[in-house]
Amino acid sequence: MILGIGIDSVDSSRFAQWHTFSRKQLERIFSAQEIDYCLAVPVNSAQRFAVRFAAREAFFKALGQSNNQHISFLTMCKNVKVINSSRGVPELQVDWSMFPALSHQSIQVFISLTHTDSVATAMVLLSAG
């Protein structure tokens, strides 16, 4: 059963200077692992930050359809991260304990990420069962 679906696109140019931000600033939104990945190739950092930000926005939208509990965007950001699986496929890792109304359910998270030089897009689907 589909619990929620979210999609978000962002202009990558908004993230052009994020590689100059302090780790403390970046850690308000991203995990240490994500920051390291985004900064590893400076020429790609804007697209990498942008698509991970879009993933959070898409998850936030999908979550809003299946959860009556109000959680701020920044709180949600600290409990969600994009990781690359051993096969190199992006996955959204969620700390479900922050979402008590949903933590008892077996929820699958499907994510698709894409970006060009100028636009980053993410789609998230939440499914129960």
Q: Which residues are covered by each model-predicted region?
A:
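Core catalytic alpha/beta fold that binds nucleotide/phospho-ligands
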Residues: 1-129
